[in-house]
Regions:
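Catalytic cores of secreted/periplasmic lytic hydrolases that degrade extracellular macromolecules
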Residues: 2, 18-158
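Sec-dependent N-terminal signal peptides
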Residues: 4-15
């Protein structure tokens, strides 16, 4: 049931973008990473539609400087508990520390683990995986991003 709802969501996303409202880069991003998003949804419960929308937004559809130099698809910063590879990038402030990965798959996996292991996101996992609006607004409420329109951006992308 969830897989069929997910596929419907993906077709809606693809149809929306195929209608010419988004760039070829967005279509390429979805095609390149949809299976990773589905796999992570099945593994952890993070909706594939949310993961793809975040990835599209955070990476400028795979073209941002940060993703090109670090495979960081979700803009996750280092913080004090990160022991992995790091890269420095200008974001809200100059020279901020971001997590760096060996592959997109590692970034997708870490994003899911980051959400699952962080108590401030725990309430999201009580939502139905098809409730992308609840997830989008919940991510903003929990402080995932500083952009005040973050949830609306995700919903619009989906």
């Amino acid at each position: 049931m969830i897989r069929s709802q997910l596929m419907i969501s993906l077709f809606l996303i693809l149809g929306h973008f195929a209608a010419g409202q988004q760039s070829e880069a967005v279509n390429n991003y979805i095609n390149n990473y949809k299976q990773l998003a589905i796999d992570e949804m099945q593994r952890t419960g993070v909706p594939a539609s949310i993961k793809l929308a975040q990835g599209i937004h955070e990476t400028e559809a795979g073209r941002s400087e940060l993703v090109l130099k670090s495979y960081n698809h979700f803009g996750i910063k280092c913080k004090t508990n990160w022991a992995g590879e790091k890269v420095y990038h200008d974001d809200d402030a100059s020279g901020e520390c971001f997590r760096s990965y060996q592959s997109p798959a590692a970034s997708y996996r870490d994003h899911s683990d980051f959400l699952k292991s962080n108590q401030r996101y725990a309430f999201l996992f009580q939502l139905d995986p098809t409730d992308y609006k609840g997830w989008a607004y919940g991510l903003k409420k929990a402080g995932y991003a500083t952009n005040i329109k973050y949830s609306q951006i995700l919903v619009r992308l989906i």
